[in-house]
From Swiss-Prot:
Residues 1-104, 173-225, 269-331, 386-766, 827-886, 932-996, 1052-1327 are cytoplasmic. Belongs to the ABC transporter superfamily. ABCB family. Multidrug resistance exporter (TC 3.A.1.201) subfamily. One of its GO terms (cellular component) is membrane. It is an enzyme of class 7 (translocase). Gene3D superfamilies: ABC transporter type 1, transmembrane domain (1.20.1560.10), P-loop containing nucleotide triphosphate hydrolases (3.40.50.300). It comes from Caenorhabditis elegans. GO terms for molecular function: ABC-type transporter activity; ATP binding; ATP hydrolysis activity; ATPase-coupled transmembrane transporter activity. It is a multi-pass membrane protein. GO terms for biological process: response to nematicide; transmembrane transport. The gene is pgp-14. Disulfide bonds: none annotated. InterPro entries: AAA+_ATPase, ABC1_TM_dom, ABC1_TM_sf, ABC_transporter-like_ATP-bd, ABC_transporter-like_CS, P-loop_NTPase, Type_1_exporter. This is P-glycoprotein 14.
Length: 1327
């Protein structure tokens, strides 16, 4: 049950959540807003309250007492470390367990202890059999009866151990699955609560890496590995107890190995912890790069930036790889040293035991074997579980990082129930002397004493240059951020005193870059208001001019729109976002460039709807297209964070100030044909202007003629020679695409396929395998030495001859220890190099091939970026199991098994046959189980939506918070993760069967080999010495099977992961190889020739139905038309994100599918509708895909894009970090950087898809002038809904319903008074 005082528990039963113990109280207005500076407020804050200034890492350093205790408890990992957070304790890993989980943990622990305690019985029973062999005549019935008693004990223990091991594995795996589900839920829940300032400092890629990589490390640490660890420690303690029971002197002597072993393990843990933390940092940064690149893959492709992004990704992975290799070194060094000390003490124990036997303190040699074998088994298994200890250490370090996020309670907490909820909202908004700077950019002040009053029911428009603080003001009103000084109030109440959820429900916002989610249109609208009916949805969609296009979708309102709304155009997305806001019926409406992506007709309809929706409510608008705000009650002009002009449209125009300059910048050319027939001669121009105008008219006429020729071609196209050529070309390309699609099935990968991809590492693998095989000869060597020792105890009386044999045994055991030390060190380092190289190669190859895929690949919901990022984060590390320390254990085991089988055949072939048969039987069972688990893994991955949803949440958390739907998305994540949880539990059952069989296998092996061996000795077929050597050999072979089988789940997972990655690595894009094709000189003539096209995900909904238009070299062609008419698709096809499905698209007369895609894109430059920047400096973003660009050229491009003015105000200039996705820049600033990125390439074809939509009028005019200069001598295709920016185009093409409806220049189309004319009249700002 949830705690009574926890109304927002969300099903989390753990009352230790600080955020549920207390909540942030309403904070009164302060001149300088630091809650901790006011003692009254500070006393009410949660213990783990933080603000953005508190997020700097606070280094943890253990005290002297802690260091001593850490070393004493084998926790040297934190004995001398300075870490950002203290690694959590082992119990702390289960802090989110519930009562049932603790019950499972208790039962599993009991079973693990029972299983561990039972292991020394093996030594005890073996000792009793040894006594029977040495004391009684081998052919006597007394020998046979005594020996057979122990056989039945082996059988009974084997059955008992198999049951306890099954229960142990199931309990730990079930508990782990449930605890990890809770931990993931809490992590996502906590991410949803964090404030905007935290996200400015914590990139979404790093958060995603935590969710995938760090969580996986914790899962590995608290699952079956913990059971194995507990079993190992129980085995060690039980072994010590048994040894002390039989002979305390010998046991005490052998216990001397403990301090040295503890020191080894502590030093190992210390080194592993520090290197793991450094490794995680590199992996996290690489994850951020991968996430950004895949989320903005079209931008990366358009600028041929694939290899640059791959280079950045690889560089960060390389940093982590170096530390991972060091982990292999330390593991091998200290692990080998452990075994050296163990075997040295083992030899000394045999020597001392022989001495005690000689002097009569020990009466039978079997007791020596019991004590020595007990201590050996305990210590040996402790050494073998050292890799599991490293896994546990990794889990503790990762958990510390995860818990920091989970425990963080921000000052602006969307889950807080505190704060006022005003009953009768009037809607008076006031900004009073507001100062603000972003937490991540303390050196740049955005608002500098803003004073603004918005009276109830009025509309106020904010205008000004990009980056002047307009959107920041909106962020302060919605409490994404808080001012550093001053107050923001609603109806006289400081927004900091209001309940956040109530505030954001009261204030509805349409953001500059609309965010939609990977769901149906219906569900996206429900996010706005979960209680809405379909009738209400249809009503608001009609208001937002969205209903008509939605009805034309394949499933109407139930159509899936893909990741980020990829199936919709920019204008369609914005209309759905507007409808989603209107359905909330907010009291205060914030419109941040709400209609920037709409065509003029849609904008007029939607603006009218917004004007109607604004009636009776306070509305704050931000718009660069001034026609949308001319009806506002008040227009305020921002500059440098303060208001410099205010008034309505007419007042500000009469004032003739800055606003008037913006209006003039957006006025259209005078239209002399508005009331009379058009005559070119009557236009009064000077000679120069007339010459220029005639040139423009000639160009326009050529374009119009081309359009008319295109229309006539449409009528008789099927019979033309060019049509036949286009059809033949399409048939060839269609056949190629069909072949690619046929190859795009599921690729099944085997272990050999993984090794085939290890080119360049074969020498390391060979040498590593050689050393691993040498390391694997340890158990056969021990079998021979034990057989040799057994013979020594037959030297009766026990005297000098026996002691000499034991002295030689000391040397033999120490020699094996030295061999193990050096072979383990060498093999561990070599395989660490191979595993990290291979994992990095798979990551890089997968990432590289993803960046080269065509757009249709990403349109497929199965290939949503969220899912692909999860695959990159988890599959490549999973493959490492085949080539890292786990593979070493298997090689050790294989070498030991083969060598022990050989020894058994040499000394007793009957035992050899029996043991080999048992091992093969177990192998067949394991293969069957592996196949079953592999199928379950594939099914689980294919059905896993939880990872995609989590990434969608992380990417769009600010939007989710503003919509007050944190809990809705959290519920969605919880629901989707239940399927994953069920799959894990089913898979755990199969893995538990495997674990049970392999861990009890040694007892069954001993049972059957001793049963047959006793019979052989009794019948006199073999001597007891040879039979004993054969049995010991097979026993140690069974130990090898048991040791290696625990890695069985990881190997199955590696095979599944390899198949998933190979599907990515070997997939060929439909657009073909980037470098193949012709590379002619591009002049810039473009022809859309009867082009037909449908998106692959919507084949029955054609976008182009015989589209025909031409752009001649050096022309500027503007594409206009309703949102969703296919304008951006035209540009996407020129960039070859998609290929035509009918007709042909030609550049300079050649089908672009025959051109090298790399060459084609080097001749083009694209400025997209939603400019995508990447983490890094402004310089790096401008030069994306280019090498060695001179600084002068970069500055020239930035100046052309009108970016130099705001750059001058940045302390680091062009070396300023723009933040993740350019988050540190305003929308207009981002767009200017994107324009500079295009201009620096000096392209032959310039593609501008709403290139100036986020710019203020003055910046737009300056940038437009720059673009006008930049397009001289090159072909320019531009899309713009702000028609003032395209009126000087040589040709304007109006596209609707998949065809060209009108074409001509501005004057010609105005003369026609058709569709274009109507759009112009809607945006006319004539004064």
């Amino acid at each position: 049950m949830a705690p009574k005082d926890d109304p927002d528990n969300r099903g989390f039963d753990d009352q230790r959540r600080p955020s549920q113990r207390s909540t942030v109280l309403a904070i009164p207005a302060l001149a300088v807003n630091d809650p901790k500076s006011d003692p009254k407020i500070a006393s009410d804050l949660p213990a783990n309250y933080v603000d953005d200034d508190d997020d700097a890492p606070k280094m943890y350093t253990p005290s002297l007492l802690e260091k001593i205790l850490n070393y004493a408890l084998c926790r040297g990992d934190i004995a001398n470390q300075q870490l950002e957070a203290q690694p959590v304790s082992i119990p702390g890993l289960f802090r989110y367990g519930k009562k049932f989980d603790y019950l499972l943990l208790f039962i599993g622990t009991i079973c693990a202890i029972i299983s561990g305690v039972s292991q020394p019985i093996l030594a005890l029973v073996s000792g009793r059999v040894t006594n029977a062999l040495l004391v009684y005549p081998p052919t006597s019935k007394q020998f046979r009866n005594k020996a057979n008693e122990n056989v039945y004990i082996f059988l009974g223990i084997g059955i008992f151990i198999s049951i306890t091991n099954f229960i142990q594995y199931m309990c730990f795996q079930h508990c782990c699955t449930r605890v990890m589900a809770q931990m993931r839920h809490r992590f996502v829940y906590s991410v949803l609560r964090q404030n905007a300032g935290w996200f400015d400092k914590n990139h979404s890629g790093t958060i995603t890496t935590k969710l995938n990589d760090s969580m996986e490390r914790i899962r590995e640490g608290i699952g079956d590995k913990l059971g194995v660890l507990l079993r190992g420690f129980a085995m060690l303690i039980a072994a010590i107890v048994v040894a002390y029971i039989y002979e305390w002197r010998l046991a005490s002597m052998m216990l001397g190995v403990a301090p040295t072993c503890c020191i080894c393990m502590s030093l190992l843990a210390r080194q592993m912890t520090s290197t793991t933390i450094k490794e995680l940092i590199g992996v996290g940064k690489a994850g951020s790069i991968a996430e950004e690149s895949l989320m903005g893959v079209r931008t990366v492709q358009a600028f041929n930036g694939q290899e640059e992004m791959v280079g950045r990704y690889e560089a960060e992975l390389e940093k982590g790889r170096k530390f991972a290799v060091w982990k292999g070194f330390w593991s091998g060094f200290f692990g080998g040293l452990f075994f050296f000390w163990l075997f040295s003490f083992l030899g000394c124990g045999m020597l001392y035991g022989a001495y005690l036997l000689k002097v009569g303190i020990i009466t039978t040699p079997g007791d020596v074997f019991i004590v020595v074998m007990s201590m050996l088994l305990g210590a040996y298994f402790l050494g073998l579980i050292s890799p599991h200890m490293m896994v546990l250490l990794n889990a503790r370090v990762s958990a510390a990082s995860i818990y920091q996020t989970i425990d963080r309670v921000p000052k602006i907490d969307p889950y807080s129930k505190a704060g006022k909820r005003l009953q009768n909202v009037v809607g008076r908004v006031k900004f009073e002397n507001v100062h603000f700077r972003y937490p991540s950019r303390k050196d740049a002040k955005i608002l500098n004493g803003l004073n603004l009053v918005v009276e109830p029911g009025t509309s106020v428009a904010l205008v000004g240059h990009s980056g002047c603080g307009k959107s920041t003001s909106v962020g302060l009103l919605t409490r994404l951020y808080e001012p550093e000084a001053g107050n923001v109030t609603i109806d006289g109440t400081d927004v900091r005193e209001l309940n956040i959820e109530w505030l954001r429900n009261t204030v509805g916002i349409v953001q500059q870059e609309p965010i939609l989610f990977n769901d149906t249109i219906h569900n996206n609208l429900l996010i706005g208001n979960p209680g809405s009916t379909r009738e209400t949805m249809i009503e608001v969609c009609k208001m937002a001019n969205a209903h008509d296009f939605i009805e034309k979708m394949p499933k109407g309102y139930d159509t899936l729109i893909g990741d980020g709304g990829v199936q919709l155009s920019g204008g369609q997305k914005q209309r759905v976002a507007i409808a989603r806001t209107l359905i909330r019926d907010p009291k205060v409406l914030l419109l941040d460039e709400a209609t920037s992506a709409l065509d003029a007709q849609s904008e007029s309809i939607v603006q009218s709807a917004l004007n109607n929706a604004s009636k009776g409510r306070t509305t704050i608008m931000i718009a660069h297209r001034l026609s949308t705000i001319r009806e506002a009650d008040k227009i305020v002009f921002f500059e440098k964070g303060v208001i410099v002009e205010a008034g309505n449209h007419e007042e500000l125009v009469r004032l003739g100030g800055r606003y008037f300059d913006l209006v003039k910048a957006q006025q259209f050319k005078a239209d002399p044909e508005a009331t009379e027939e058009f005559e070119e001669e009557e236009i009064d121009l000077d000679d120069t202007s007339r010459s220029s105008r005639r040139s423009s008219m000639t160009s326009a006429r050529s374009g119009s003629e081309a359009f008319r020729r295109g229309n006539s071609l449409n009528d008789s196209f099927s019979g033309s020679k060019r049509s036949a050529q286009a059809d033949a070309e399409n048939s060839a390309f269609a056949a190629n695409e069909a072949a690619i699609m046929a190859e795009d099935g599921q690729i099944t990968a085997g272990y050999l396929d993984i090794f085939k991809n290890a080119k360049g590492n074969y020498l390391y693998m060979f040498l590593g395998t050689v050393f691993a095989l040498i390391r694997g000869l340890e158990l056969p060597a021990l079998a021979l030495i034990f057989g040799w020792v057994f013979e020594g105890f037959t030297f009766v009386p026990y005297g000098g001859r026996m002691m000499h044999r034991m002295a030689m045994a000391v040397i033999a055991f120490a020699s094996v220890g030295v061999g193990v030390w050096f072979s383990q060190l060498a093999s561990s380092v070599l395989f660490a190099v191979v595993s990290e190289n291979l994992s990095m190669r798979f990551r890089v190859q997968s990432f590289r091939n993803l960046l080269y895929q065509d757009a249709s690949y990403f349109d497929n919901p199965a290939h949503a970026p969220g899912k692909l990022i999860t695959r990159l984060a988890s599959d490549a590390p999973n493959i490492k199991a085949v080539v890292d320390a786990r593979m070493l254990q298997v090689i050790y085991a294989l070498a030991a098994i083969i060598a022990n089988i050989a020894i058994a055949f040499i000394y007793c072939w009957q035992i050899g046959i029996l043991g080999t048969s048992l091992i093969l039987l177990l192998a067949f069972v394991m293969i069957g189980l592996a196949y079953k688990i592999s199928l379950m893994n594939v099914e689980q991955i294919q059905n896993d939506d939880a990872g995609r949803i989590a990434i969608e949440i992380i990417e769009n958390v600010k939007t989710i918070q503003l919509l007050t739907r944190c809990e809705l998305f959290f519920d969605h994540y919880q629901t989707s993760s239940k399927q994953q949880k069920r799959s894990e539990l089913k898979k755990g059952m199969i893995e538990a069967i495997n674990y049970s069989l392999t861990q009890s296998f040694m007892y069954f092996m001993m049972c059957f080999t001793y049963a047959v061996g006793i019979r052989i000795i009794y019948q006199g077929d073999k001597s007891s010495d040879d039979t004993f050597k054969g049995i010991i050999a097979m026993m140690l072979g069974a130990v090898a099977v048991m040791n290696s089988a625990q890695y069985f789940p990881e190997f199955v997972k590696a095979k599944t992961a390899a198949g998933m990655l190979f599907n990515i690595i070997y997939r060929k894009p439909r657009t073909g190889d980037l470098m193949e094709g012709d590379r002619p000189e591009i002049r810039g003539n473009i022809l859309f020739e009867n082009v037909k096209f449908s998106y692959p995900q919507r084949p029955l909904q054609p976008i182009m139905k015989g589209l025909q238009w031409t752009a001649l070299r050096g022309q500027t062609v503007a594409l206009v038309g309703p949102s969703g008419s296919g304008k951006s698709t035209n540009i996407g096809m020129l960039e070859r994100f998609y290929d035509v499905t009918g007709g042909a698209l030609r550049i300079d007369g050649q089908d672009i599918r025959k051109l090298s895609l790399f060459h084609l894109r080097t001749q083009m430059a694209l400025v997209g509708q939603e400019p995508r920047l990447f983490a890094g400096t402004i310089r790096e973003n401008v030069c994306l895909g280019l090498k060695d660009v001179p600084l002068e050229k970069i500055n020239q491009a930035l100046e052309l894009a009108n970016a130099n003015r705001f750059l001058a105000n940045l302390p680091a200039g062009i070396d300023t970090d723009v933040g993740e996705k350019g988050g540190q820049l305003s929308g207009g600033q981002k767009q200017r950087i994107a324009i500079a990125r295009a201009l620096v390439r000096d392209p032959k074809i310039l593609l501008l898809d709403e290139a100036t939509s986020a710019l203020d009028s003055e910046s737009e005019r300056a940038v437009q002038e720059a673009l006008d200069r930049a397009r001289e001598g090159r072909t320019c295709i531009t899309i713009a809904h702000r028609l003032s920016s395209i009126q000087n185009s040589d040709l304007i093409v109006y596209i609707d319903k998949g065809k060209v409806q009108e074409a001509g220049n501005h004057t010609q189309l105005m003369h026609q008074k058709g569709r274009y004319y109507k759009l112009i009249k809607k945006q006319d700002l004539a004064v």
